[in-house]
Amino acid sequence: MTTQPLPRHHTFEKVAALQANVERVIRGKSEVVQFCIAALLARGHILLEDVPGVGKTTLAHALARSLSLSFQRIQFTSDLLPADIVGVTIYNQDAQEFEFVSGPVFTNILLADEINRATPKSQSALLEAMSEGMISVEKKRLPLPEPFLVLATQNPIEHVGTYPLPESQLDRFLMKLTIGYPNTIDEKKLLRSGGAHDALEHLEPVLEAQEVRDLQEQVSAIHMNESLVDYLMSIVHTTRTHAEAALGVSTRGALTYFKACQALAMVNGRDFVIPEDVKRLAGPVLSHRIVMKDRRLLRGDVTPEQRFIQRIVSEIPVPR
């Protein structure tokens, strides 16, 4: 079922208002905010990998408040059970029947905090819900609310007591992002203002759930010309055939890359994709989907996979 498209300028005004609203709380991180909004519009999910205390939870709260959507947070720990995520069936003595008590996954925006601290069984319960948009309970299929966005946070792999997500589950995330520390000027403003709490408390919604669903429907109408599709596919194909890569980008990864480029174009007020969209999203969308034969870490914050993607993008000719 398709929705009636909104007027073009109206569509872009709504998305711009959303970005501006979130940036009232998350300062100096415009690109991260843009990528998160693009993931939402593309019906994807986000893995935020960063050290504690840089604003991952605040970002999730700011998005939920800006969109007037329901929000839940799950703290993933080693003793978390799948039922703690999806819910549990209990016996109602008054009604003399079994009834399902829904878990926190039944929400619009879910913050899965420190997902790599839970066991693989609990991780899988969430990732199944992410991929299907439904929960299976007692031979029934229960749909999750729409829109549905998971922001999963993950501490860097070198932290003790974690269960790294396998490649097949990492592939479920549209983007893997890092917020990073703010620059000196923005951090000084944050100190002067007493933190982001007050700004978050006073944040008013700028979009309703139905408006978000309408925007999601319109993403597929964003145009990408044939030369750009070929450019995108050249990047994807190189990850599969390059001698340094043990595992390349899947077909699902290529599809989500295409959709993310359309969504980012919308976030930037365009009804067409440009080469810069494809280049900007290559790292966030593709780097967590590949495995390098040589996993030795390089100096700095860039992983071997990120460096590999950067090199591919720099070497493949950009269409004119």
Placement of each model-derived feature along the sequence:
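Conserved alpha-helical scaffold flanking the Walker A/P-loop in AAA+ ATPase domains
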Residues: 34-38, 91-111, 140
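C-terminal engagement/docking regions of AAA+ P-loop ATPases
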Residues: 2-5, 9, 241-320
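P-loop (Walker A) phosphate-binding loop of NTP-binding proteins
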Residues: 51, 85, 153
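Canonical AAA+ ATPase core
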Residues: 92-97, 118, 122, 130-207, ...
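AAA+/P-loop NTPase substrate/partner-engagement loops
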Residues: 66-94
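Pre-Walker A (pre-P-loop) alpha-helix and adjacent loop at the N terminus of AAA/AAA+ ATPase modules
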Residues: 9-54
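Walker A/P-loop
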Residues: 40-77
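Walker B catalytic acidic pair
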Residues: 50, 113-114, 125
